[in-house]
């Protein structure tokens, strides 16, 4: 869309100075996973600047309440019980807050699956979107006759919350898979 309509403007593409970040932090619901919880919580705690945290998982919520970090919600979302529908509801709240300027960036801290022997605490940048069309995409866009009805801005506004929901749900599923799978020492 950004390549096809160079005049497209969207709050999801803006590159402003990042003053406040919303961190979605996914940890386990129990403390039985050794480094699983501590690694992702250390990763989140290393985030620089002002943060607002959306904790997913009981250990995530307990950690940030104990450290008096501002929370996006007081509701405790159990990682093992988060549904696709809840992720879509969360994504609408996340994107609405982003559009209103309550925070300038959205990131997810979760445990990434590298292999059965290696899992890594990771931070994924979700918003603002980093979309730099290649020269080939720009050339193809100039040749194309794509006309957006509704406007490209309205299309962005409709699909980005869906995109964010998919990213959040994928990170929750990946983290929960690792949390519940047998460790190499089992």
Regions found by a protein language model. Give the residues of each.
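C-terminal beta-strand-loop-alpha-helix "lid" module of Rossmann-like NAD(P)-dependent dehydrogenases
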Residues: 1-181, 185
């Amino acid at each position: 869309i950004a390549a096809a309509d160079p005049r497209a403007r969207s709050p999801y593409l803006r590159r402003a100075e990042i003053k406040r970040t919303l961190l979605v932090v996914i940890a386990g619901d129990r403390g039985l996973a050794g480094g699983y919880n501590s690694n992702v919580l250390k990763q989140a705690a290393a985030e620089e600047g002002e943060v607002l945290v959306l904790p997913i998982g009981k250990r995530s919520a307990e950690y940030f309440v104990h450290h008096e970090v501002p929370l996006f919600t007081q509701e405790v979302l159990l990682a093992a019980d988060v549904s696709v529908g809840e992720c879509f509801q969360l994504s609408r709240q996340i994107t609405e807050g982003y559009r209103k300027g309550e925070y300038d960036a959205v990131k997810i801290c979760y445990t990434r699956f590298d292999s059965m022997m290696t899992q890594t605490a990771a931070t994924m940048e979700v918003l603002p979107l980093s979309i730099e069309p290649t020269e080939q995409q720009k050339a193809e866009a100039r040749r194309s006759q794509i006309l957006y009805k509704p406007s490209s801005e309205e299309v962005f506004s409709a699909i980005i919350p869906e995109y964010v929901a998919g990213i959040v749900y994928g990170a929750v599923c990946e983290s929960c898979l690792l949390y519940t799978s047998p460790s190499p020492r089992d």
